[in-house]
């Protein structure tokens, strides 16, 4: 008798993706973040669905509907905070996942990598639109400032901004469309994630050494299912610690004040996971230049396969590149810190230096280091 999981059309897909999938025997915990992102996405779609049942996308009632969810709905507070803090967990997993891809040279899987970059953009757009929905001060002014950046585009900029706003300022039309897009985009992200996985399974997973592992593979289940379950438990534990003990730790106090178009907060800033890009944006005095730098700070990931000059795929045996990679991580942490500080001395110059360092490391120093390491191999 043949096994149903290998013959049934639907079960076969699941079997080939999660059970009998040939997986390198030496992949480390850095390979856990893909499954953790999947768990984050499912968790956030479910909590978002329950929030949408009680939320009203109207400027007059949006803020009070969020208050109503927290105060009157059964377990509404935990659903709301799991959704909000889930965004932070999602972002941490995303950064770790991308960082692992950079470190171990996973960007040589071109289709998988490029779809991953599209997924990153889609997730950032979704998170931004979600931040606008509670209609607090930072929601309103964040939406105003970030959408206004599009006005820097020559010729069509102003028309484009007014088209997105649905009027001459951020108002009811903007909130309604942001809710519509925020509700639908996670399903697009889920579909893209499926395509991401499809292309990954065409080539098979990379491994820490970056070498071919066809001769030494093991089935995904039970070895990596148990490993992923451990990762999932740690993720949920961290999330619940955040939700139950410090739910507002990563939020902005200004968002507990209803949106007021007549009163600008002293310091407008996005959520913490956008601060690195926001710091790069602010470090360039010219508006269009800042917007281009902001987009390029993420789009630069697409160039990684072209900038790869090393004969080795992974950084595991490349000490100079390793050193530069960790300097890049420190630089991103510096940018995150600067993005949350006011625009004054010495933060301006630190932000500008960190921004220059970011692009120089990726575009110049890392390819040079790889070439030096290639020559060292000849010794």
UniProtKB/Swiss-Prot annotation:
One of its GO terms (biological process) is mitochondrial electron transport, ubiquinol to cytochrome c. Its cofactor is heme b. Binds 2 heme b groups non-covalently. The chain crosses the membrane at residues 33-53, 77-98, 113-133, 178-198, 226-246, 288-308, 320-340, 347-367. One of its GO terms (molecular function) is ubiquinol-cytochrome-c reductase activity. GO terms for cellular component: mitochondrial inner membrane; respiratory chain complex III. It comes from the Eukaryota. Keywords: Electron transport, Heme, Iron, Membrane, Metal-binding, Mitochondrion, Mitochondrion inner membrane, Respiratory chain, Transmembrane, Transmembrane helix, Transport, Ubiquinone. SUPFAM superfamilies: a domain/subunit of cytochrome bc1 complex (Ubiquinol-cytochrome c reductase) (SSF81648), Transmembrane di-heme cytochromes (SSF81342). Heme b b562 binds at residues 83, 182. It is found in: Mitochondrion inner membrane. Heme b b566 binds at residues 97, 196. The cytochrome bc1 complex contains 11 subunits: 3 respiratory subunits (MT-CYB, CYC1 and UQCRFS1), 2 core proteins (UQCRC1 and UQCRC2) and 6 low-molecular weight proteins (UQCRH/QCR6, UQCRB/QCR7, UQCRQ/QCR8, UQCR10/QCR9, UQCR11/QCR10 and a cleavage product of UQCRFS1). This cytochrome bc1 complex then forms a dimer. Heme 1 (or BL or b562) is low-potential and absorbs at about 562 nm, and heme 2 (or BH or b566) is high-potential and absorbs at about 566 nm. Component of the ubiquinol-cytochrome c reductase complex (complex III or cytochrome b-c1 complex) that is part of the mitochondrial respiratory chain. The b-c1 complex mediates electron transfer from ubiquinol to cytochrome c. Contributes to the generation of a proton gradient across the mitochondrial membrane that is then used for ATP synthesis. Belongs to the cytochrome b family. This is Cytochrome b. It comes from Raphicerus melanotis. The gene is MT-CYB.
């Amino acid at each position: 008798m043949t096994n149903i999981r290998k013959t049934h059309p639907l079960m076969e897909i699941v079997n080939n993706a999660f059970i009998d999938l040939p997986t390198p025997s030496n992949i480390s915990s850095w390979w856990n973040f893909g499954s953790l992102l999947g768990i984050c996405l499912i968790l956030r779609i479910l909590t978002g669905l329950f929030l949408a049942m009680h939320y009203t996308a109207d400027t007059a009632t949006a803020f009070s509907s969020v208050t109503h969810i927290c105060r009157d709905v059964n377990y509404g507070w935990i659903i709301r905070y799991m959704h909000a803090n889930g965004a932070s967990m999602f972002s941490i997993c995303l950064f770790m996942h991308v960082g692992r891809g950079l470190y171990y040279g996973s960007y040589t899987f071109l289709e998988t990598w490029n779809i991953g970059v599209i997924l990153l953009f889609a997730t950032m757009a979704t998170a931004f639109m979600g931040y606008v929905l509670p209609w607090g001060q930072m929601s309103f002014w964040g939406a105003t400032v970030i959408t206004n950046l599009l006005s820097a585009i020559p010729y069509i900029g102003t028309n484009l901004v007014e088209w997105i706003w649905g009027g001459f300022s951020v108002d009811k039309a903007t909130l309604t469309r942001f809710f519509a897009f925020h509700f639908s985009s996670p399903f697009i992200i889920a579909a893209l994630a499926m395509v991401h996985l499809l292309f990954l399974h065409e080539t098979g997973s990379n491994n820490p050494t970056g070498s071919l592992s066809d001769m030494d593979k093991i089935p995904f289940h039970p070895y990596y299912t148990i490993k992923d379950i451990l990762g999932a438990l740690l993720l949920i534990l961290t999330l619940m610690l955040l939700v139950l003990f410090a739910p507002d730790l990563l939020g902005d106090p200004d968002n507990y004040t209803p949106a007021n178009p007549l009163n600008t907060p002293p310091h407008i800033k996005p959520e913490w996971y956008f601060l690195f890009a926001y710091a790069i944006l602010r470090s360039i005095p010219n508006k269009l230049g800042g917007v281009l730098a902001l987009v390029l700070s993420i789009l630069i990931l697409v160039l990684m396969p072209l900038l790869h000059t090393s004969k080795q795929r992974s950084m595991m045996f490349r000490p100079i590149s390793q050193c530069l990679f960790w300097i890049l991580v420190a630089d991103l942490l510096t940018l995150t810190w600067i993005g949350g500080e006011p625009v004054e001395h010495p933060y301006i110059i630190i932000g500008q230096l960190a921004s220059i360092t970011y692009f120089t490391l990726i575009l110049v120093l890392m390819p040079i280091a790889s070439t030096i390491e290639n020559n060292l191999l000849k010794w």
